[in-house]
Design a protein with these regions (language model features):
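Residue-level detector of functionally pivotal "anchor" positions at catalytic/ligand-binding pockets or at interdomain
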Residues: 584-608
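Extracellular beta-strand/beta-solenoid scaffold signature
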Residues: 102, 145-157, 183-206, 302-312, ...
Length: 632
């Protein structure tokens, strides 16, 4: 068989496998036609408990960035310059570090300050850093520096202080960026202190300056706020709606219906950065007098008496990483908090203060912490596989607003944390913390992610709020959400889980599941009453009096995806990017189909039970039968 014919055969075989898996996906025959929680949201009922999460994602969920697999076609469309690492000294597959070539490109893009000699920031780099097919090493022990006096070894981050830049490979099955050796910790006693290998960032100059004092109140879902003077605010600006308050009433309201506990110094301490801290990043849509109108709904009620204000948000935009795989060497015998090599030695990438930026079609193999979006807004990660040796964490939105994490398949392997002697190697445990959120995050969506059997969604304390876990599946381990005792609660108001499919539990976990463990100094899980709709799979007994809503437990509900339903309702139709995303086959075995068995009309429905138009391409349900519509 010729090479071309063989390749065609493999592609057709893969396509057939994908289509067969999708068409034979399990259909839930007992699904509700429409769950009451959705009806109350649509009708804006007095007892509605759902926030509008549809503004999460790139350009508020309306579209995706320009997508071309051919780097030169992409560059032409965008008006960018391509910097091929091989043209600057990188040699793939030679086992030698290619860091110097990458540094040459950064310097060529940014230039240096003639006075200080430091690299310049580049807000609009308009550059694509391209890694052709092959394996490239961007960190090895040879890249470390050693202090001549103390002999301390330091690993240094590759900082890209720029916007409008894309790091692109030839495909995640073709381009591999490798961490050959661990990133050394700044302090071995601080287990998370190893730096990232690559950080694409704004360094924060001009951030957090007060622009106006908030004078009016607002409810969750409102789109505007009254301020004292709006003269420093402009249409199109990105700003922070900000609160830091030690007011005892504010703390009491924030923790209601629970009381503050002595261990909670983050929310109840006297330090400069302690107290109730809300950071809701917004783009300015319009200004009418001293009323500031946002593009997005406010996700936290505003009481001006507590000292709310509008602040600057320093950031860059349009940063992307796509079509490659990061490879590390996470320990074969990972144990949580066993040491710095376990918790953070291999952290390939983070974004810091980026807006409308993305990671797509990027895989992670044997990584400690896969990807962190920190102080970002409306960024996304879509279509990612996590495999190899398990590590500390997956993908998180940290101190970020309206991010979107979708279609992550996390099935890394290793040992249970209770297996102190490493006697039984297990597959599909997943990262210790699965996809999720951390710190003062708000409005983020984790969508159709599938994580391992010994994991749970991450909710890493320090005041995250208003998070949606939508159509996700995987383990549901108690006490796995993360966060130090002084940073609790793990999650404040408006934790929402929609159609979660529980695939594994720990038989040794307490029953019933506690959302607010009463023990003050050893209560490692505390979240305000959550909203669960359509929680199904393995049975979990919940304490109902610790929940805001537990609707239709044991059943999948319609709409299948809350994010999709809200976005479709807002825009009038489902955007093409989300239609395409639903057909992504990473982790295809986890696909669930919900059939609206009451529909006897001739309408065509997608796999979430939502009506779609005649131009929809993919697997659909019509008159109770699954079929292909159009061509994938």
């Amino acid at each position: 068989m010729g090479q071309g014919v063989g390749l065609l055969f493999l592609l057709m075989k893969k396509l057939f496998t994908i289509l067969f898996a999708a068409l034979s996906a399990t259909t839930s025959l007992h699904a509700q036609t429409t769950t009451p929680a959705w009806q109350k949201f649509v009708n804006n009922a007095d007892d509605n408990v759902l926030l509008d999460f549809s503004y999460a994602g790139y350009h508020h969920g309306t579209e995706q960035p320009v997508d071309e697999r051919d780097v030169y076609v992409l560059a032409k469309k965008l008006g960018y310059t391509v910097y091929n690492v091989c043209d600057h000294g990188a040699i793939p597959n030679d086992g030698i570090s290619d860091r110097a070539a990458f540094e040459k490109i950064i310097e060529k893009i940014c230039g240096r300050n003639k006075t200080t000699g430091k690299l310049n920031a580049k807000p609009e780099a308009k550059a694509i850093i391209y890694f052709p097919e092959g394996e490239y090493i961007l960190h090895s022990k040879d890249d470390n520096t050693t202090n001549a006096e103390t002999r301390k070894v330091t690993s240094n981050t590759l900082n890209l202080v720029m916007g409008y830049v894309i790091i692109k490979g030839a495909g995640r099955d073709k381009t591999f960026i490798k961490m050959e050796d661990p990133m050394q910790p700044t302090n071995p006693n601080i287990m998370y202190s190893s730096p990232k290998m690559i950080s694409i960032r704004h360094n924060g100059g001009g951030d957090n300056n007060i622009l106006a004092k908030v004078t009016g109140s607002a409810k969750k879902g409102d789109m505007s706020i009254e301020v004292d003077y709006a003269s420093k605010i402009n249409v199109g600006d990105w700003v922070k709606l900000f609160l830091l308050s030690k007011d005892k009433n504010a703390i009491k309201e924030e923790l209601y219906p629970y009381d503050v506990q002595a261990s909670m110094s983050n929310i109840n301490g006297s330090g400069e950065k302690e107290g109730v801290n809300v950071v809701d990043r917004h783009q300015i849509k319009a200004i009418e007098g001293n009323r500031v109108i946002f593009e997005e709904p406010i996700m936290h009620a505003v009481n001006p008496a507590y000292g709310w204000d509008i602040r600057t948000y320093a950031h860059y935009e349009e940063v992307g990483v796509e079509d490659l795989t990061f490879k590390g060497k996470a320990k074969d015998n990972f144990h949580h908090h066993a040491g710095w090599e376990d918790d953070g030695a291999y952290k390939p990438l983070d974004f810091m203060r980026q807006v409308n930026s993305w990671v797509r079609r990027v895989d992670f193999v044997s990584i400690s912490e896969c990807m962190t979006f920190s102080e970002c807004a409306n960024c996304f990660l879509l279509d990612s596989e996590i495999s190899g040796n398990r590590g500390h964490s997956s993908v998180r939105m940290q101190y970020s607003a309206r991010g979107f994490i979708g279609k992550v398949w996390d099935h890394s392997n290793g040992y249970l944390n209770d297996d102190k002697n490493f006697t039984e190697y297990k597959e599909n445990l997943g990262q210790y913390h699965a996809c999720g959120i951390s710190k003062q995050s708000i409005g983020n969506v984790i969508w159709q992610c599938h994580w391992g059997d010994d994991s749970c969604f991450e909710s890493h304390a320090t005041q995250p709020r208003a998070s949606l876990f939508d159509q996700c599946c995987g383990g549901f381990m108690q006490f796995r959400m993360g966060g130090d005792i002084n940073q609790l609660p793990n999650h404040l108001d408006d934790l929402t889980m929609w159609n979660f499919n529980c695939l594994a539990t720990n038989p040794n976990d307490p029953v019933p599941f506690n959302w607010w463990v009463k023990n003050t100094w050893n209560g490692w899980y505390k979240t305000l009453p959550p909203t669960l709709v359509g929680f199904h799979g393995k049975n979990v007994s919940f304490k109902e009096d610790e929940m805001k809503l537990n609707e239709n437990q044991g059943k999948e509900v319609l709409p299948g995806s809350l994010y999709e339903a809200q976005l479709t309702r807002r825009l009038g139709s489902t955007p093409q990017w989300l239609i395409d995303a639903k057909n992504i086959t990473t982790g295809i075995e986890s696909v669930k189909t919900i059939e609206n068995t009451n529909n006897t009309d001739n309408k065509t429905y997608d796999l979430n039970g939502m009506p779609v138009g005649k131009n929809y391409k993919g697997v659909v349900v019509k008159k109770g039968k699954k079929m292909l519509n159009g061509v994938i």
